[in-house]
Every structure is written in structure tokens, then in C-alpha cells.
Amino acid sequence: MNLPKTLLVATDFSECAEQALDYAVALAGKLDAKIHLLNVIGVPSMGIPEVGVAVTNTLIESTVRTHHAELDKLASRRPSVHIEAVLRTGDARDVIVDVAREVGAELIVMGTHGRRGVRRALIGSIAESVVRTAPCPVLTIRAHKD
């Protein structure tokens, strides 16, 4: 078995995702691995009148700029490993798996919010979907309180 040299870390900028990134950074340091830090912007798929398209595009462009800056900030605070920021739009469940294939990820690291019961059934679990469909092992990190 070869140890992973390419890690994909999915972030939604939550505390749980930041803990997953810290775990991945520690792991990457020990394995001399590279990290691809991915954020997925969910874009609603609904019919929008032509007038609203410009507003929606402006909002998406603004969100992309903000999320790029946040990814760069997360990476710059962890200079001990090579982190490449990746920003995509779409359904996170699909995009995470697609990007894992694109970058040749050998391990996906992501946080889990630990939703239970009805909320989990209604919302679904991104982590659970990724575990089922990923082309490589997936390490999920539960948020812990200090």
C-alpha cells in the first residue's frame, strides 16, 4: 500500500471544515503530500427572468471573489505544506468527487457536521454521499469542542 501524496480537502469555511484542514495539514506534513483545498459554491438551478440574470451573475462573481480570498487566507495561514486553492460551482456532492478524480486525489479529507434525525434525512449528508461515490478513501473529521 502506498501512502497518499495528493489530498483533497473540502471546505465550507465552517469550524468543522477548518479542523479537517488542520488534520490534513498535519497528515500532509508527515507524508510530504500536497493539498488541494476545495470550496464549492452552490448555485441554485431555477428559472430566472432575464432581468434577474445580471443581478445573479453579479452576486455569483462577488461570491467567487470572496471565496477565493478566503481560500487564499486559509492556505497562507498554513505555510508548512503546499496548498493549492480550487473553487468550483455546483452540487458539492458531485463536485468533490469530480475534483478528486481531476487532481488524482488519493485521500479526501472533510468535516462532518454530525446532523441527525429529520434534519439529516431532509438535507442529506454531503460527507455520506462522497464516501459512497469517491474514487479514493475518505477521511471524515467530526468537530470537537475545545
Where are these regions (language model features)?
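Structural beta-alpha unit
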Residues: 1-3, 23, 30, 75-108, ...
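Small/aliphatic-rich secondary-structure junction motif
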Residues: 2-54, 146
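General small-molecule cofactor/ligand-binding pocket signal
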Residues: 36-38, 84-88, 139
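A short acidic, glycine-rich active-site loop
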Residues: 55-69
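Short beta->alpha linker loops
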Residues: 66, 87-91, 113
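Gly/Ser-rich helix-loop-strand patches that form or flank binding pockets
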Residues: 99-146
